[in-house]
């Protein structure tokens, strides 16, 4: 995640969109200069434009003259008297105990670990601000359960409350009043109803973007919609509309106020707001309580109304139309958003982006804010310009209004008189594409020539899997295996791919401890954290799943076309994730830039463990090629115990033998947390038992058991020995080192059969190195089309 985010941000920095500095000697309006160029700034959250208020600036000067630039003492020991004046003024506005903090984020970090106690439970809205999500991690460290609901889904919230109320002391719902990405509102009337109906429900709500511009005396959106409930803590900002510094926590009673002030970590260990900005805060609070303040709000309300009206007239879309000053225009992938922002900059307008990871990868957009420093004419001209640049930018990136409508599931938009015809380069002029629903439609020799040396996605395997994974009772055992080939005008294959639409576990590649927790939760809900995925290859096969002819001059266009096809199929099939696999490091380097622009992020897959040097003559020769560490391990852990085992190479024939082999596999599957996949059906094993390309190795303990204690199921493909599945009896596995022993016997078997290479598949790197395997870097590229499962898994960490 961090590496992918770094690449996305750095791309935007390199394109001159992010991490810029103003070059103004003085800023006195909504205009800013960046690199010497003037822009009208629509990226400011100072909604009422009070940063240029003479009253506030004079207060800053006076406070500085009286108290200096800082008063550097923890509030636990001593606060400058301006704090008391500011908190008293805020109390008059809100009629609730007010605790001023150095920032809204520091307020969350101070309050939440004190308010949320042992036995409580937290429910987060999916879109709640990052600062609350970060603070929730502290609660998780204190063993507080964290749950997440879809954005503004009150039915899901009530369902969670009913589920948790018997065991929880308190249930804390955490939300925003005005959400910072989409500018939409929390459904406060419904939340208030739930607070009244469920005694254990409590509300912690951040109204940073609602403060000032609305509500009586500017007390914000939340308090404009409901009274301060006696089970509600309100956090808001003294930045943004308030134009000062810091945050404020509003409590329903003095006891909560006292406890957070006494015990909140950032109240003790963080620095205070400094005198100049305390002066600004006091002046702003006085202004909020003045007769003229309502005029500022009314003026701003007219601008919000005008902006919504103008967007509608121009046919520009909004994800959620509200009366907030924060607007989100749906676009799509990050590269599309950046294209439009760059175009708007060239026209003299500075807008923000909203994208991954705050939104799903394909659901980024333009984010702009209006404020009282803007005139109606400023807003009108910016939106008129945006209408044109929005469409041109979409088309330049291969998108369209229709695509945005489909992706965001919003109503069709754009004034028909403005709609432009675009002339895209048609792919059929450079290659032909074939979408196939069965491997039977593809010549086996041609297909295997591309794939047989690189894993198990070979013709005969795919033919079997098509038969096995259809018409089954279990959802996870019904796969749609499809094929996509792209040929140039001479008929040569430029790209060939097999891909599968299947129900998969969302923790497929999650860390072991997290997968272990999820595995426990699946004992109650078998399909917990599962979703429909598209992955290249199949959930059973491994190795190369996309062939690309990098020598063909059109390979990049072919790859883009393939990804676009997968994304279209994902949209039509309610797919949550797309995973392209498996690529070596050189391949990854060639394609990562293209795929990142298409919204797919690099994923480090488990190493592939391969014995590719088969020139050794005997065990001593094999051992001589290992490092000293692994020579010792092979001798002491494996060869020393080899005499305890009988080894048989046979195909399971009788029903009992076949079923027992399956049981040994199930033992391993039930213990595995490194790669989370569904248990394979017995139906597949029956195909394997009958397939002459499969080789079976059984281990028996000479003195301990009449039944095999381990089995390795491998497939020989084009003289490569592919270890597919292992089975173990855990009554003996650890004591006798059965897994290590069967790995060694697998290597010996492949050598005996004259195979040129052994593919020992993924995981258990250390054990496989002991028998001569070398780890090969293995990469994938993934796109999460929705955030829900990712956020849910984060809450379980």
Language-model features: where?
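Conserved PLP-binding catalytic core of the aspartate aminotransferase-like
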Residues: 294-305, 314-347, 370-372, 376, ...
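PLP-dependent enzyme catalytic core of the Aspartate aminotransferase-like
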Residues: 54, 58-62, 66, 88, ...
């Amino acid at each position: 995640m961090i590496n992918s985010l770094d690449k996305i941000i750095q791309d935007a920095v390199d394109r001159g969109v992010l991490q810029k500095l103003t070059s103004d000697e003085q800023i006195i309006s909504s205009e800013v200069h960046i690199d010497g160029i003037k822009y009208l700034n629509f990226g400011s959250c100072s909604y009422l434009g009070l940063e240029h208020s003479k009253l506030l600036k004079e207060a800053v000067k006076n406070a500085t003259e009286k108290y200096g630039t800082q008063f550097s003492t923890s509030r636990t020991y001593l606060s400058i008297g301006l704090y008391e004046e500011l908190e008293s003024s805020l109390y008059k506005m809100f009629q609730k105990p007010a605790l001023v903090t150095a920032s809204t984020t520091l307020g969350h970090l101070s309050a939440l670990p004190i308010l949320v106690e042992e036995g409580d439970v937290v429910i987060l809205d999916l879109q709640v601000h990052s600062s609350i999500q970060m603070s929730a991690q502290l609660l998780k460290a204190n063993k507080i359960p964290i749950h997440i609901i879809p954005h503004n889904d009150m039915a899901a919230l009530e369902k969670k409350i009913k589920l948790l109320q018997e065991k929880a002391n308190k249930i804390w719902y955490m939300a925003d009043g005005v959400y910072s990405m989409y500018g939409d509102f929390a459904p406060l009337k419904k939340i208030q109803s739930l607070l009244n109906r469920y005694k254990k429900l409590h509300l912690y709500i951040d109204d940073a973007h609602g403060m000032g511009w609305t509500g009586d005396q500017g007390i914000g959106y939340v308090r404009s919609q409901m009274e301060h409930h006696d089970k509600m803590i309100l956090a808001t900002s003294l930045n943004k509309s308030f134009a000062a510094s810091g945050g404020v926590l509003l409590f329903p009673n003095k006891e909560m106020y006292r406890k957070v002030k006494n015990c909140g970590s950032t109240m003790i260990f963080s620095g205070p707001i400094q005198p100049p900005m305390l002066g600004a805060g006091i002046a702003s609070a006085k202004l909020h309580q003045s007769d003229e303040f309502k005029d500022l709000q009314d003026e701003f309300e007219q601008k919000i109304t005008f902006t919504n009206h103008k967007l509608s007239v121009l046919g520009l879309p909004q994800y959620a139309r509200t009366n907030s000053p924060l607007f989100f225009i749906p676009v799509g992938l990050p590269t599309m958003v950046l294209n439009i922002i760059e175009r708007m900059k060239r026209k003299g307008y500075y807008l923000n982006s909203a994208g991954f990871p705050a939104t799903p990868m394909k659901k980024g957009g333009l984010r702009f804010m209006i404020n009282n420093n803007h005139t109606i004419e400023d807003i009108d001209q910016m939106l008129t310009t945006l209408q044109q640049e929005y469409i041109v930018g979409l088309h330049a990136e291969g998108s369209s209004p229709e695509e945005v409508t489909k992706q965001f599931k919003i109503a069709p938009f754009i004034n028909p008189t403005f709609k432009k015809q675009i002339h895209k380069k048609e792919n059929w002029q450079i290659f032909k594409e074939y979408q196939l629903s069965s491997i039977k439609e593809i010549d086996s020799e041609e297909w295997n020539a591309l794939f047989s040396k690189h894993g198990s996605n070979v013709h005969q395997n795919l033919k079997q899997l098509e038969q096995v994974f259809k018409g089954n009772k279990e959802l996870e055992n019904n796969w749609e295996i499809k094929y996509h080939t792209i040929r140039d005008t001479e008929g040569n294959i430029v790209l060939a791919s097999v891909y599968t639409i299947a129900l998969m576990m969302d923790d497929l590649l999650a860390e072991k401890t997290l997968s272990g927790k999820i595995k426990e939760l699946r004992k109650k809900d078998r399909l917990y954290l599962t979703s429909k995925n598209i992955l290249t290859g199949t959930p059973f096969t491994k190795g190369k799943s996309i062939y690309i002819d990098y020598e063909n001059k059109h390979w990049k266009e072919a790859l883009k076309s393939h990804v676009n096809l997968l994304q279209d199929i994902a949209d039509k099939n309610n797919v949550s994730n797309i995973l392209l696999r498996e690529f070596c490091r050189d391949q990854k380097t060639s394609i990562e830039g293209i795929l990142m622009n298409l919204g797919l992020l690099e994923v480090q897959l488990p190493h592939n463990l391969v014995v590719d040097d088969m020139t050794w003559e005997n065990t001593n020769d094999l051992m001589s090629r290992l490092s000293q560490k692994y020579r010792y391990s092979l001798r002491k852990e494996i060869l020393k115990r080899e005499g305890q085992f009988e080894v048989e190479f046979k195909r399971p024939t009788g029903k009992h033998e076949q079923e027992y082999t399956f049981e040994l596999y199930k033992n391993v599957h039930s213990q595995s947390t490194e790669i989370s996949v569904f248990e394979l059906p017995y139906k597949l094993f029956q195909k394997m038992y009958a397939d002459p390309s499969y080789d079976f190795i059984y281990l028996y303990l000479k003195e301990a058991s009449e039944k095999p204690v381990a089995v390795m199921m491998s497939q020989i493909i084009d003289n490569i020995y592919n270890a597919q599945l292992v089975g173990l009896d855990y009554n003996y596995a650890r004591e006798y080192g059965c897994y290590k022993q069967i790995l060694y016997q697998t290597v010996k078997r492949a050598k005996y059969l004259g195979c040129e290479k052994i593919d020992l598949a993924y995981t258990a790197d250390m054990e496989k190195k002991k028998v001569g395997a070398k780890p090969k870097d293995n990469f994938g590229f993934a796109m999460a089309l929705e955030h829900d499962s990712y956020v849910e898994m984060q809450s379980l960490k």
